[in-house]
Design a protein with these regions (language model features):
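Soluble periplasmic/extracytoplasmic beta-strand elements of cell-envelope proteins
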Residues: 55-60, 73, 125-130, 142-146, ...
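Short secondary-structure boundary motifs at beta->alpha junctions and helix caps
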Residues: 80-88, 154-185
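C-terminal/domain-edge helix-coil "capping" segments
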Residues: 24-32, 36-46, 169-196
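Surface-exposed short loop/turn segments
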Residues: 24-43, 107-153
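C-terminal motif of bacterial Sec signal peptides marking the signal peptidase cleavage site
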Residues: 19-22
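Bacterial N-terminal signal peptides that target proteins for export
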Residues: 2-12
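N-terminal secretory signal peptides
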Residues: 39-59
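N-terminal segment of the mature soluble domain
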Residues: 53-121
Length: 196
């Protein structure tokens, strides 16, 4: 009888340990998001070489440190922010904005060679500062920052921007779509200011 009790205790301990491990291993699914491309003329790829003497160098994109994390940021109250742990950017926000900016401005400004690499002496040098790129408790996507553009004669122009794009639905999918739309609207406005 004495030998049965220790065996029973061992079986009971193993069973409880197995249950504990089984309950604690609930895997949380992570979702990864990328800024969408919604420009209608983006799909028109030229099959011929272009010639231009206009070069736009995207020198830097500085994203506020609280935004440049792997998790998507939400403003939960007037002075409170939270970074998502399971809804993440597929690449850093600064990298995604750089990629979008190069690709979209190339489409929007066909007379310019646009690159984040300094290929030659630039006609225009662009610095971008992002101070807001997040969801808000108001149900909007918030995009804020400023452009600093220097021409070849060292003339400097700045343009601040602030956009609130209403979400069409709840959730991170809707937030990223609203951020993408707001960003491309800002790129369009910036491109128009360069053309004129």
């Amino acid at each position: 009888m004495i030998k049965i009790i220790p065996k029973f205790q061992i079986v009971l301990c193993v069973t409880l340990f197995t249950l504990l491990i089984g309950c604690s291993s609930n895997k949380v699914n992570k979702s990864y998001y990328q800024l969408a491309n919604n420009l209608s003329n983006q799909n028109q790829v030229s099959q011929t070489m272009r010639s231009t003497n206009q070069f736009m160098w995207i020198e830097s994109i500085d994203v506020a440190s609280f935004l440049n994390k792997s998790g998507i940021v939400l403003q939960t109250e007037n002075i409170k922010y939270a970074t998502a742990t399971n809804n993440l950017w597929v690449a850093s926000l600064s990298q995604q904005l750089k990629d979008r900016l190069e690709q979209d401005l190339t489409a929007l400004l066909p007379n310019y060679l646009v690159s984040s690499n300094q290929i030659t002496t630039p006609s225009l040098t662009v610095k971008l500062f992002i101070d807001g790129f997040h969801g808000s408790y108001t149900g909007d996507a918030i995009i804020e920052g400023r452009w600093v553009v220097t021409d070849s004669k060292n003339n400097i122009k700045t343009k601040a921007f602030a956009r609130q794009v209403p979400l069409t639905d709840n959730g991170y999918d809707a937030l990223v779509k609203a951020l993408s739309k707001g960003w491309q609207d800002e790129e369009q406005d910036f491109a128009n200011s360069i053309k004129h």
